[in-house]
Amino acid sequence: MEEIRESSNFIHDFVAEDIAPGGRFAGKTVHTRFPPEPNGYLHIGHCKALCIDFGTAEKFGGLCNLRMDDTNPAKEDTEFVDAIQEDIRWLGFDWGDRFFYGSDYFEKTYELAVGLIKKGLAYVCELTPEEFSAYRGDTTHPAVSPYRDRPIEESLDLFARMRAGEFPEGKYTLRAKIDLASGNFNMRDPVLYRIRYIEHHRQGTKWCIFPMYDLAHPIQDALEGITHSLCSLEYEDHRPLYNWVIENCDVPSKPRQIEFARLGINYTVMSKRKLRRLVEEGRVSGWDDPRMPTLCGLRRRGYTPHSIRDFTDRIGVSKVTSTVDYSLLESCLRDDLNANAKRVMAVLRPVKLTITNYPEGQTELFDVENNPVAENAGTRPVSFSRTLWVEQDDFMEEPVKKYNRLYPGNEVRLKGAYIVRCTGCVKDADGRVTEILCEYDPETRGGNTPDGRKVRGTIHWVDANNCANAEVRLYDMLFSDPEPDAPGKDFIDCLNPNSLETLTGCKVEKSLEDCTATDRFQFLRLGYFAPDNKDSAPGHLVFNRAVALKDSFKKD
């Protein structure tokens, strides 16, 4: 993994204090965890948490566990478990042998819940959610519960029968007995367990009661020896409950919860529910559609692990929620690919160019640089012949002002080859240009002018006698509105109808037939491109535009 520049954050400050002499974790190894819920694919928003969890452990020479938070059986699937692991490995992080499932702790969590009942700190409640809301009180009136003083033995019996499947969903819950007058409503006897008759992706039908996140999460952290439980800001007012569970359950360690602000990016949505709707309604081709903010979508589009880690590093860690410009993500990729991507020539909207005074049947090879900003990138041989492909918009029969490319009488430099002068064109019956006619100056091999004359325009080209055909997909923002998620909007109405343009019959250098899914290229003058890791195959090359050469962000 390439070096990412160092940036300070308050989490690292807290961790440094905790492991210093006299700190709460003095002498201990820093131990974090990344606990995704396997009910969808990871997206760029998760990436911030992922990089914070793994990055914090990495910085302090510690460990980071990967734990599937599968305590809620609804919509959890092994498909997502596998995809999450692939995404994390792709980013360059490693959890070693510390891969866990939250459901692995179901039995222990149940035992600890029984312990809370025995201590008089939990009770079985018969109130429905609607009824409890009525009993819950408000900021000036404490809550009340008719079941709060249920005898311990009765709660133990009912809880065991809940596990045995004797009651329907919604009949009973297990509640913590904390403080019905607390100003933090999360502490007003929160639900710890509920009845759900639903098959679990790993446990099958073994369990019909499932722990709530606020109970399961701190117990799992403590059982794994986590020192720092790093989570998003929405859990800040859940921290007292997290600490209450740790203090009152017989667990082997006492982790510290620290919260940070979530990542928001304009021109996108990151709700799993909304992303799932895009997939299910066929508005994108799948979770890995290159327009999606999922990591598999970004990878397919052409994003690199370094660019995404650089992005999370640049935005930093904060307690203040903010929205980041999508252009920053593009900039990180552009910087990475500018330094590392091989330069090649591709013609997306081809028109034939014939050099009328070039010998028929002759082919030359030119050594063309692979990357002018990379010292050891070297060169590659590119073939050149009488017939080339060039871009349609590199020719105008009647040029506009300051147009320096091909038009009758004008000279241009063919990148790395010769200088040619346009002598005319050939049109079809409808008046469309089908061929551009030029003459070359044989004294200008390599693009130099021995007589010192100035040639303003330089265009790219592909040898028509030695090239490959390709399909090229030009991607833009999935949404045309910078705030598709804003209140009062249906995000579907904000979809960009021009987010994808597919071009067929494109012409690329012959060498690209041997490219692999991990290769990244700069198509000269056109942008940065990557082979589509799903659709591209020998004999059918498909390239995705990962990012334009310049900032495409729409500014007011």
Model-predicted regions and their roles:
Residues 66, 70-72, 115-275, 333, ...:
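Active-site cores that bind ATP or allylic diphosphates and position pyrophosphate for catalysis
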Residues 235-239, 243-245, 306-309, 313-316, ...:
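Core subunits and conserved enzymes of cellular information-processing
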Residues 36-38, 67-75, 97-107, 130, ...:
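Conserved short loop/turn motifs at secondary-structure junctions
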Residues 253-332:
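Long, charged, mostly alpha-helical binding arms that flank functional sites
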Residues 21-26, 55-63, 89-96, 119, ...:
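Secondary-structure transition/capping motifs at alpha-helix termini
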Residues 80-106, 112-115, 120-123:
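A glycine-rich helix N-cap at a beta->alpha junction
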